[in-house]
Amino acid sequence: MATVGEWSCVRCTFLNPAGQRQCSICEAPRHKPDLNHILRLSVEEQKWPCARCTFRNFLGKEACEVCGFTPEPAPGAAFLPVLNGVLPKPPAILGEPKGSCQEEAGPVRTAGLVATEPARGQCEDKDEEEKEEQEEEEGAAEPRGGWACPRCTLHNTPVASSCSVCGGPRRLSLPRIPPEALVVPEVVAPAGFHVVPAAPPPGLPGEGAEANPPATSQGPAAEPEPPRVPPFSPFSSTLQNNPVPRSRREVPPQLQPPVPEAAQPSPSAGCRGAPQGSGWAGASRLAELLSGKRLSVLEEEATEGGTSRVEAGSSTSGSDIIDLAGDTVRYTPASPSSPDFTTWSCAKCTLRNPTVAPRCSACGCSKLHGFQEHGEPPTHCPDCGADKPSPCGRSCGRVSSAQKAARVLPERPGQWACPACTLLNALRAKHCAACHTPQLLVAQRRGAAPLRRRESMHVEQRRQTDEGEAKALWENIVAFCRENNVSFVDDSFPPGPESVGFPAGDSVQQRVRQWLRPQEINCSVFRDHRATWSVFHTLRPSDILQGLLGNCWFLSALAVLAERPDLVERVMVTRSLCAEGAYQVRLCKDGTWTTVLVDDMLPCDEAGCLLFSQAQRKQLWVALIEKALAKLHGSYFALQAGRAIEGLATLTGAPCESLALQLSSTNPREEPVDTDLIWAKMLSSKEAGFLMGASCGGGNMKVDDSAYESLGLRPRHAYSILDVRDVQGTRLLRLRNPWGRFSWNGSWSDEWPHWPGHLRGELMPHGSSEGVFWMEYGDFVRYFDSVDICKVHSDWQEARVQGCFPSSASAPVGVTALTVLERASLEFALFQEGSRRSDAVDSHLLDLCILVFRATFGSGGHLSLGRLLAHSKRAVKKFVSCDVMLEPGEYAVVCCAFNHWGPPLPGTPAPQASSPSAGVPRASPEPPGHVLAVYSSRLVMVEPVEAQPTTLADAIILLTESRGERHEGREGMTCYYLTHGWAGLIVVVENRHPKAYLHVQCDCTDSFNVVSTRGSLRTQDSVPPLHRQVLVILSQLEGNAGFSITHRLAHRKAAQAFLSDWTASKGTHSPPLTPEVAGLHGPRPL
């Protein structure tokens, strides 16, 4: 327990003697410094510290009471009060010519303060004030032997930056508030004090006084005298009730704004020689201030048009008030008032602008700046509204946030601005003097492009995020409909002929008579009349009923998905009946997840029955998903014809693979079908829980409908694969007909008499009445065309990268850089965008291909391709896929397509194609877009990068050498052919001769339904020594028609590069290698 002569430390509770100022254990000060104590330093503690013993003496004492030390003030200076713990330098005696200054009254604008200062009989020189202020900041006002702590008055060494006792800073960061600006809202005199009412100072407007009295000039003998310091008192007459506006940050002192000519005082009212009627003085004052502070202008304060001005409002009626009275600080928020609709406040610099102004007059910020919805990156510039924020700088002059971070203003010759702290450093300084940021970083940030690398996202996390954002929009729509008592109508897909999309004279178009909501629809199934409408009601695959549309590819995929009801529920974001008729469906269109908003108005006939797909027992999920898909592709008409694998990819967004069971009738030279490998893939897919479907009697097969129907099968129909079993060497599959009827009646069917007893009890073949049956694998291969596998991984990661297929080698080549952090299994899927839209100008399918390489990135991001690790087959389809197991490292994924390459420049041979539609121009105004979907079992990083023009040639050469057929034509020459399974032909020739040229002629004029990247089916080339070249790439043009390729190769050695007698004109390549094809077909060094 502490005695009378002891005190307890607030930090360590040690009992210290009463005369000790700090704790002897932890050196904590006896009294914890607080804000009120610091603020009172400028109000009531008007003492000066002794430079020798640090004792604080009253202002009236000329010598220290303790040690007798007498300071040596400047001539004519008086002891001044200590303001905020800093001894101000006494003002020097100014010798101004007589008549140079006049009495001046009015508001004096300071940093964050608006105070009214009485006239002092002379005008203070502003340059001298700036000099004094700068000297105070540099420490000129401190004693030479050290400095006094403004908190505990201890005299510290000159090199110390903080007090050694209390830890206080050498200089306080509080604003310097002169006594004249302090607010005393009400004066309450304590006991023993007599307050004398103060008369208004001369020069201030008061009762019966003019607001602007005429200025009087001083006489010739009038000498300037130092400003008289009024006797200090907390209740001095110089203290006026002036509120101190609360600023959002400390800023340099604002300049007095230029006064319009009509409101300017006469020249005799101010300092002589000051420029009148212009803002030149303010601009130069700002430049001098910035050069003195050595700080660059902040981005939000600098404008591209010049120096702007942010006024601090001369009236503070609407501002928050901070009152400093005695030992208290009182904060009074501004009282609420009626909103001011004549002005708006800038969100960036807080300047109030007129309502009609679309931009801030100070910083140029848009009136709507800062209002951006959460979601995908904005597609319009927030300032000018131009499409694509990347080229926005060319349309409105504004820069993106990434460019703002790289641009630092202003920089002067011989200086550079630090991007971290904005300090202006000398050009010879390699690091910032304040924060040590290297100067090299400035140059790197100027030329660096914004980072586009991103991590893959968990599949389930992505779905939950998309649903959360979609539900917020849905709730707003439903709330609006409820308030206005209306039902939702989707104006972007209106109930009309355009949404149906069939030709005007088509029978389907004519049968659509009306669009009805569920409560208005007549049910076509009699047993469902008493059922109530719902989105789901214990959904089953057999609930699906096809309508007039030929979209069985989609319904077959939906039936396969219905084997897992949880997957169907993930497709429907709105899972319960909505009285307002607004529903949301989440689909993956062309590899991109999209949440589609639709209403519940469905096309019906004149009897009120649904015409398109529906579900039994008055369920809406089939009709709503079909309508959402029709909206995505433009109309119901666009949903006709397709493959079940496309539907699975659209509904799940998962990687899908199709296994062909039959040889291609359009290309007999394709690789033979390996039934054992397909069986192994089906077994592993079943164990992994993947979805599987099978196409019966379609595609490449010649079908006899009567033969199929006699066996209980339906040709050109999709079945779901429920189970795959290998029982005692017998390969069996269990399938389901989505119709719920028509089952297989051959061997291993329910009524087959040769069932082994133990297998009948184990496999329980009793579902033929519901369309479920067992089938032997041999019969399955005989009657079915293909197997579609949907690899649904609920715990995998996914990333999707958009890009485009260049239509020539002169366009930038897009490559996706892939960073694998730990060993992972990856699936790649490449989708062509807009391949199904009915309104597309050129929606023909491309010959898609994926190539995965080991890669290295050198200095400057230079990409070097390594070994080929995986690839897909080149196929004219809506999407292709491949899978690979990758170790940690850097990889590059190249996506390519060639059958859309445009014709060469004028003056060169016209493009030559041998196809049924050779006369149709294939060049598209814009390169076709694509989406690369990356699925991985572990976290990976993806980044789209721009490769060199020759990267595509290097990728094709590595592919052909790795997977093509090798042919040694002659000594030192090697030819590589890639044709089987590649939807065309690729020919690469290698010349290993150290000195001789190799002349090669490739003739493919007898080919059919192919197009050449060279623009001609006949080429001649001269390959230099120790080089190799991609001679030609032939690509299948029409995917639904067969193609044939014949090629003849002639070659010879030559001492010169010219082709001589092979061409009419002297040259090394025919057709010539124009910039459009040189990047792909130019010779490459070995």
From Swiss-Prot:
Pfam families: Peptidase_C2, Zn_ribbon_RanBP. One of its GO terms (molecular function) is calcium-dependent cysteine-type endopeptidase activity. Residues 111-148, 199-280, 299-321, 1064-1086 are annotated as: Disordered. PROSITE patterns: CALPAIN_CAT, THIOL_PROTEASE_CYS, ZF_RANBP2_1, ZF_RANBP2_2. Keywords: Deafness, Hydrolase, Metal-binding, Microphthalmia, Phosphoprotein, Protease, Repeat, Thiol protease, Zinc, Zinc-finger. One of its GO terms (cellular component) is cytoplasm. Residues 223-233 have a biased composition (Pro residues). A zinc finger (RanBP2-type) spans 3-32, 44-73, 143-172, 338-369, 412-441. The modification Phosphoserine is found at S296, S335, S338, S1070. The active site is at C552, H717, N737. Residues 125-140 have a biased composition (Acidic residues). It comes from the Eukaryota. InterPro entries: Calpain_cysteine_protease, Papain-like_cys_pep_sf, Pept_cys_AS, Peptidase_C2_calpain_cat, Znf_RanBP2, Znf_RanBP2_sf. GO terms for biological process: proteolysis. Residues 487-793 form the Calpain catalytic domain. SUPFAM superfamilies: Cysteine proteinases, Ran binding protein zinc finger-like. It is linked to Oculogastrointestinal neurodevelopmental syndrome: An autosomal recessive neurodevelopmental disorder characterized by growth deficits, microcephaly, global developmental delay, hearing loss, and microphthalmia and/or coloboma. Other congenital anomalies include imperforate anus, horseshoe kidney, and structural cardiac defects. Some patients have been reported with normal motor and cognitive development. Belongs to the peptidase C2 family. This is Calpain-15.
